[in-house]
Design a protein with these regions (language model features):
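Short, charged beta-turn/beta-strand-edge "cap" motif at the junction between a beta-strand
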Residues: 2, 8-18
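Conserved AWS/pre-SET-to-SET junction and N-terminal core of the SET lysine methyltransferase domain
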Residues: 1-7, 208, 215
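Charged low-complexity "KEKE/polyampholyte" interaction tracts
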Residues: 19, 24-220
Length: 220
């Protein structure tokens, strides 16, 4: 029996965009469950009892409750951690200096991650727009000339799809198989764009907190 005109609600649980991409082949523009894990010093893990999976940056760029708590405790002198531990675990700021230190450390860590990535967010945006406009093999083969920073990635895609021997000027349309590969490539770029945006939003968030806590100097 088939029922028509009924709304169907699908629930994918608390998957991040990377997990959705791996398991279902799509991502969400605004996924409240998306998150970014940043590398942490071993002492950060050992100085608190928060599980590793709770130490991340939210989709909106804000550090998780657990990550902030762990960083505040880690930034506290070891001889004071026991007395201030209950405040850190309750989500309270321990001091202005401590909070500024935590925000500076987090922003620097995010900035380092972004700098070590092979492409910039602006380059990914341009590449994504260009891929969406591709209609034939000539346009695809010309991409490597336009996007120097993504040349290796583009060449890898061309080689993986056995297109390296296609002559320029052939005006051949993309095969169904190549288009499917391009769709997957498109999704991969979308994912890394959102990954980078979370890191950038975290830097902005940390900068705002630092500005709000820093003493204001007014002209005489």
């Amino acid at each position: 029996m088939v029922l028509y005109s009924l709304q169907v609600l699908l629930c994918y649980g608390t998957y991040t965009n990377l997990e959705l991409l791996e398991h279902y082949g799509f991502i969400l523009n605004e996924n409240p469950n998306d998150k970014v894990f940043i590398p942490l010093e071993p002492e950060i893990y050992s100085s608190s009892s928060w599980p590793k999976e709770s130490l991340y940056i939210h989709q909106n760029g804000k550090p998780s409750f657990s990550l902030l708590s762990a960083l505040r405790l880690w930034a506290t002198p070891p001889n004071k951690r026991r007395s201030l531990g209950h405040l850190a675990y309750s989500g309270s700021q321990l001091s202005v200096d401590n909070e500024i230190l935590v925000m500076k450390w987090t922003a620097k860590k995010c900035n380092t991650i972004l700098k070590n990535l092979p492409t910039l967010i602006e380059e990914d945006s341009l590449l994504l727009s260009a891929i969406n406009e591709i209609q034939d093999l000539d346009t695809l083969l010309e991409l490597g000339k336009e996007f120097s920073t993504s040349r290796d990635e583009i060449q890898a895609f061309i080689k993986a799809n056995n297109l390296q021997n296609v002559e320029t000027g052939s005006n051949l349309l993309l095969s169904r198989k190549t288009r499917r590969s391009m769709d997957r490539w498109n999704l991969a770029i979308q994912w890394r764009l959102r990954y980078k945006k979370i890191l950038l939003d975290c830097i902005s968030y940390c900068s705002e907190i630092i500005d709000s806590l820093s003493p204001k100097i007014f002209p005489p």
